[in-house]
């Protein structure tokens, strides 16, 4: 290092530089606790958030509540459902149902579809004829059974998996 660079480094640090080649020094283990680490961890998402400003916390979109009640930030409590139920008396039944749907969406899950016996019978009959129904058949079934088309598609996927599993088990029993 040239004398000018060494002098500049001393001015930046504000203290004379001491060169130590010990493992502790190289790894930075000999630094005092109050010293700031020389390298920052690589967190590209932090740079994006910090450029948005100090109030750039990402929040779950929840419908507005009556009487100026605000929903708590998801990070405030590990279980948002429990926190939301504290405010249960303030909401009508439809608002509570909407809130529960929002919380299910937050967890990435939709409520499980409970098929009636009649719906299952119709779906099983169609499955016996065609285990890979096209979109037109699924939409027709959805209309007749009062279900969403994607629920019917998932039902057929699950039914094919069940059939495959039963074939595998029967092959295992024969061997």
UniProtKB/Swiss-Prot annotation:
Keywords: Developmental protein, DNA-binding, Homeobox, Nucleus, Transcription, Transcription regulation. It holds the Pfam family Homeodomain. GO terms for cellular component: nucleus. InterPro entries: HD (IPR001356), Hesx1 (IPR043402), Homeobox_CS (IPR017970), Homeodomain-like_sf (IPR009057). The keyword DNA-binding applies. CDD domains: homeodomain. GO terms for molecular function: DNA binding; DNA-binding transcription repressor activity, RNA polymerase II-specific; RNA polymerase II cis-regulatory region sequence-specific DNA binding. Interacts with TLE1. This is Homeobox expressed in ES cells 1. It comes from Oryctolagus cuniculus.
């Amino acid at each position: 290092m040239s004398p000018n660079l060494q002098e500049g480094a001393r001015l930046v640090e504000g203290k004379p530089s001491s060169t130590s080649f010990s493992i502790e020094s190289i790894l930075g283990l000999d630094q005092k606790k109050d010293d700031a680490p020389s390298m920052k961890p690589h967190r590209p998402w932090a740079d994006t958030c910090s450029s948005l400003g100090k109030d750039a916390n990402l929040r779950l979109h929840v419908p507005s509540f009556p009487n100026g009640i605000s929903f708590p930030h998801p990070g405030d409590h590990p279980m948002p459902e429990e926190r939301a139920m504290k405010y249960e008396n303030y909401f009508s039944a439809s608002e509570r149902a909407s809130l529960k749907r929002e919380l299910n969406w937050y967890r990435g899950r939709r409520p499980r579809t409970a098929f009636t016996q009649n719906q299952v019978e119709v779906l099983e009959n169609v499955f016996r004829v065609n285990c890979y129904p096209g979109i037109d058949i699924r939409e027709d079934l959805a209309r007749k059974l009062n279900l969403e088309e994607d629920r019917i598609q998932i039902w057929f996927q699950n039914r094919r998996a069940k059939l495959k599993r039963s074939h595998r088990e029967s092959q295992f029993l024969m061997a």
